[in-house]
Amino acid sequence: MSELRFFTSTTEVQANHILDLLSLEFGEEDYAIATTEVDEKRDIWETSIYLMFDEEDDILARVNAALVTEFPDLPVEREVIPDIDWIAKSLEGLTPVRAGRFLVHGSHDRDKVRPHDLAIEIDAGQAFGTGHHGTTAGCLEMIDSVVRARRPRNALDLGTGSGVLAIAVRKLVNVPVLATDIDPIAVRVAKENGTRNGVPNGIEWRTAPGFHSTAFGEFGPFDLIIANILARPLMKMAPQLVTHLAPGGSVILSGILASQRWKVIAAYNGAGVKHVRTIWRNGWVTIHLQ
């Protein structure tokens, strides 16, 4: 089914405020909401929400209701998104990525693997996480560092996407890993990636929204929890996430802009874990707490 977006065109300050209003309206639901700079000189920004055609009337009404008080005369525009696999298209020709001892590469770059690399083969596809984004690469580097310092007895990869982080843990240490994602397609792709990378066993792949699954009680508590999601849901889930952490365990968080770092750290300090280290990559941060 094709996708479309509703969007507004405003200044940067207004765009950020609209983003907050739409996030309040749709924050608990699975809609992508984003701001994009269109014209730097004229300070024109677009704030967009992406949806499917069959949701059009309901979502437009909710967008208008969310904005009417503070932006009563602001037009909400509509655009159909071309039916193109943008993930695969944008990642064509990407070179291998090194992060710690890991080398993440596509199947076309197998010849780039060195004898001592911990190689992970991930092709562009339907799930996030090929190592090229600063958040994924930062997590891989932090996993290498944390596991070197203290071998975990088990691990949780929350929001596994392509499965690259769960696969990385298994390549470092032979311990059980629970990998979950809200998207069943991502879970299927991740499981296939695990088999392709020589770890068909030892990773339990589960479809689970947030912590709403019996799997967390079944396999936890965890010595290592990794969550590469986004700052807002990470902050919201802080108390619940920490309840699944074993005493002395480590938390690795990413999907966080550098400007959001202290807010996330504060949320997790309040939940009982303290900041250990931060890695910066391309405007994104990966945080280790314990």
UniProtKB/Swiss-Prot annotation:
<feature type="binding site">
    <location>
        <position position="136"/>
    </location>
    <ligand>
        <name>S-adenosyl-L-methionine</name>
    </ligand>
</feature>
<feature type="binding site">
    <location>
        <position position="159"/>
    </location>
    <ligand>
        <name>S-adenosyl-L-methionine</name>
    </ligand>
</feature>
<dbReference type="GO" id="GO:0005737">
    <property type="term" value="C:cytoplasm"/>
</dbReference>
<feature type="binding site">
    <location>
        <position position="181"/>
    </location>
    <ligand>
        <name>S-adenosyl-L-methionine</name>
    </ligand>
</feature>
<dbReference type="GO" id="GO:0016279">
    <property type="term" value="F:protein-lysine N-methyltransferase activity"/>
</dbReference>
<keyword id="KW-0963">Cytoplasm</keyword>
<dbReference type="InterPro" id="IPR004498">
    <property type="entry name" value="Ribosomal_PrmA_MeTrfase"/>
</dbReference>
<dbReference type="GO" id="GO:0032259">
    <property type="term" value="P:methylation"/>
</dbReference>
<comment type="similarity">
    <text>Belongs to the methyltransferase superfamily. PrmA family.</text>
</comment>
<dbReference type="Pfam" id="PF06325">
    <property type="entry name" value="PrmA"/>
</dbReference>
<dbReference type="InterPro" id="IPR029063">
    <property type="entry name" value="SAM-dependent_MTases_sf"/>
</dbReference>
<keyword id="KW-0949">S-adenosyl-L-methionine</keyword>
<keyword id="KW-0489">Methyltransferase</keyword>
<keyword id="KW-0808">Transferase</keyword>
<comment type="function">
    <text>Methylates ribosomal protein L11.</text>
</comment>
<protein>
    <recommendedName>
        <fullName>Ribosomal protein L11 methyltransferase</fullName>
        <ecNumber>2.1.1.-</ecNumber>
    </recommendedName>
</protein>
<feature type="binding site">
    <location>
        <position position="228"/>
    </location>
    <ligand>
        <name>S-adenosyl-L-methionine</name>
    </ligand>
</feature>
<dbReference type="InterPro" id="IPR050078">
    <property type="entry name" value="Ribosomal_L11_MeTrfase_PrmA"/>
</dbReference>
